[in-house]
């Protein structure tokens, strides 16, 4: 059965380092929303309405800094039972060197050292345990990479050492852009980490789409997403969808409704919509 895993990178107030490289971008007014913790509160209220209305769950991949600065909002979203909460590091720290271009402005961020990665993962998992009573098992790596963590046993060792059981890190194509091809979930057996499941996030990230096509292109994104639903339904694929808290506000989801309509369309086509963690659990027996 075709399946969509819905995940929201919940990163408002944790991405200032990255966004500081794009102050000259014409999209910076939209990016500014990602600096204000109140954006996270607005977004989670909106996402709760959307998911309650459509009747499907999702995973929030939360940065630790976002979690602490919008704690009440994340707790309220989790309490609805609609959202599984996993992590997105503490400060949106990269596992690999990042080079990203948006509107002819290019930003470069170096990969974080191993000790920083491990401490960020460990600390964020502790926060989720302390404030939500959640045992964190999943990680969305910031940015996403072509081939995920393939051929990087050093990074997989950090993931394992932090007690994480699945990672969603393959989110770029060979040109470091989107759309990402429909590579399917796999375990890192070749690297010696068969206990770690990779759940790629394919097609278009919402932020990459809007950076490419403009933040007023929600209707066009909906058309593209419907095409993706048709494709996975026909080929019986797993689609790891990646959206962002602040992008729901920046793209005016409440008025445009591209996200709500996408979820409704998926259900209408007989596609299962679930969380990343649910898929990991039933695939691995975790």
Give the positions of each predicted feature:
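Acidic (Asp/Glu)-rich catalytic clusters
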Residues: 45-55, 67-93, 129-132, 160, ...
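Acidic-and-aromatic substrate-binding clefts and catalytic sites of carbohydrate-active enzymes
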Residues: 36-41, 61-72, 93-98, 114-117, ...
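Active-site beta->alpha N-cap acidic-glycine motif
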Residues: 1-84, 135, 140-144
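A conserved mid-domain beta-alpha-beta active-site/ligand-binding segment of alpha/beta enzyme cores
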Residues: 191-227
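Catalytic domains of cell-wall/extracellular-matrix polysaccharide-remodeling enzymes
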Residues: 68-69, 108-198, 252-257
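Hydrophobic faces of well-ordered beta-strands that scaffold small-molecule active sites
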Residues: 4-8, 58-60, 85-88, 137-139, ...
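Surface-exposed, active-site-proximal loop segments in enzymatic domains
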Residues: 20-28, 95-112, 209-213
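C-terminal domain-boundary segment and adjacent tail
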Residues: 166, 171, 219-286
